[in-house]
Amino acid sequence: MDTTAVASKGSTNVGSSTDTLSTSASLHPSMNAGSVNEYSEQQRHGTNSFNGKPSVHDSVGSDASVSNGHNNHNESSLWTSGIPKALEEATKSKKPDSLVSTSTSGCASAHSVGYQNIDNLIPSPLPESASRSSSQSSHQRHSRDGRGELGSEHGERRSAMDGLRDRHIRKVRVSQLLDLQRRRIRPADHTTKDRYGIQDFNFLQTLGTGSFGRVHLVQSNHNRLYYAIKVLEKKKIVDMKQIEHTCDERYILSRVQHPFITILWGTFQDAKNLFMVMDFAEGGELFSLLRKCHRFPEKVAKFYAAEVILALDYLHHNQIVYRDLKPENLLLDRFGHLKIVDFGFAKRVSTSNCCTLCGTPDYLAPEIISLKPYNKAADWWSLGILIFEMLAGYPPFYSENPMKLYENILEGKVNYPSYFSPASIDLLSHLLQRDITCRYGNLKDGSMDIIMHPWFRDISWDKILTRKIEVPYVPPIQAGMGDSSQFDAYADVATDYGTSEDPEFTSIFKDF
């Protein structure tokens, strides 16, 4: 049986939604002091609310997901275990890079920011697709066959036709792949209720804490495998009017089944608490890795973005909007693949739109800030923010002043560093599009507009989905299954789990 781990770092979120648990990142060095884009964890998770005061929810989001090693994978790391020493030395001497400032209208100006480009620290690229190489060889073949000017034109036309044909074949293959993955969903009558009890687990340590409770690393007393259990206090959920969101989280996780989404194995409750048994992700948060590296090389960011895209496409096809995409909610399993965790903000939708103001301020779409009804397109906006932050080391609209942050988002003007490739800028300009009728992911072809974008030309989507691609980073898991070294240590406190005295709210949470 495959199990994977769950514990995601919470951040200050705005609006009313299920307050899930939090786990701090391992290391968050401040970005280049004195830079016009200084950005630290404290600033990211500080006074982020519409009134400039700390949010009512001190932390929102947590789970922990990691594989227990029961899948066969043919993978090896492009990095050595852990963060290379060369990376640490390189980041000590950063040279400023110029930026190109653009908005949806294509304006440009010059700025500077001190972030070190670390592309040379990743020795090997991700595999390139066969379609790209075949197109290039076709172009070379027909160029050689040309005789004079007419022959050259003929060769160029043939090369262009071959390119269109290869693109069409690639699009058909990816469409078939997406159709297959979208059908994987648990039956509607699948239940998680009372599959386990408190007596089935040995509680080892705390992985994260939050407003509603804690996340614990546990070991099963039956199969000896490791899991993460999220414990939520019923009274706090009721007092903060989060009953519906909590029940939605349980229902959604009980239905979804995807390689890049955490698994909910079962739920149970005692008199005072709700328990959710999920994967344990031993590799820690992507946020922690990003802070250690300052920013990712393009090939690395592209790899993680591809796994997120497949997961979002799956959720959207099954009428689920995620609403809280950010590096803190992306965990690495022991093999280096992502797991999306923390579905406290996720919502089932069909033809109706969402209205709740929720999410992480830096990642909020403009339609959410404007208090307008919104749909799944908000997730694709967040994808654009995620890709930008992975490439640059900071989100595109960041400001220390919360109100200025929201103004920046509504204005939609993005400053692209000079080291961003033209393809990445083009993709981001279509994702960070204020007009949802023009935003990639929300158009006629849906996620295919993103998947088929030239920035992903060298991505083999079938290998991504089947996890048969070489990962850019393998977490340094040294103690084997159950290794929690990639998470911060928390002080354990006495708990009264398992009590049966004075049961509260049992009828409200009857599906747990």
Curated annotation (Swiss-Prot):
GO molecular function: ATP binding; cAMP-dependent protein kinase activity; protein serine kinase activity; protein serine/threonine kinase activity
Domain called Protein kinase: residue spans: 201-456
Residue ranges, compositional bias (Low complexity): 16-27
Enzyme Commission numbers on file: 2.7.11.11
Name of the top EC class for this enzyme: transferase
Biased composition (Basic and acidic residues): 143-166
Residue positions of the active site: D324 (proton acceptor)
Gene Ontology terms: biological process: adenylate cyclase-activating G protein-coupled receptor signaling pathway; adenylate cyclase-activating glucose-activated G protein-coupled receptor signaling pathway; negative regulation of gluconeogenesis; negative regulation of induction of conjugation with cellular fusion; negative regulation of transcription by RNA polymerase II; positive regulation of microtubule depolymerization; positive regulation of protein export from nucleus; signal transduction
Record-annotated AGC-kinase C-terminal domain positions: 457-512
Chain positions with Phosphothreonine modification: T356
Residues annotated for ATP binding in this entry: L207, G208, T209, G210, S211, F212, G213, R214, V215, K230
PANTHER family cross-referenced by the UniProt entry: CAMP-DEPENDENT PROTEIN KINASE CATALYTIC SUBUNIT 1, CYCLIC NUCLEOTIDE-DEPENDENT PROTEIN KINASE
Stated family: Belongs to the protein kinase superfamily. AGC Ser/Thr protein kinase family. cAMP subfamily.
Protein name, per record: cAMP-dependent protein kinase catalytic subunit
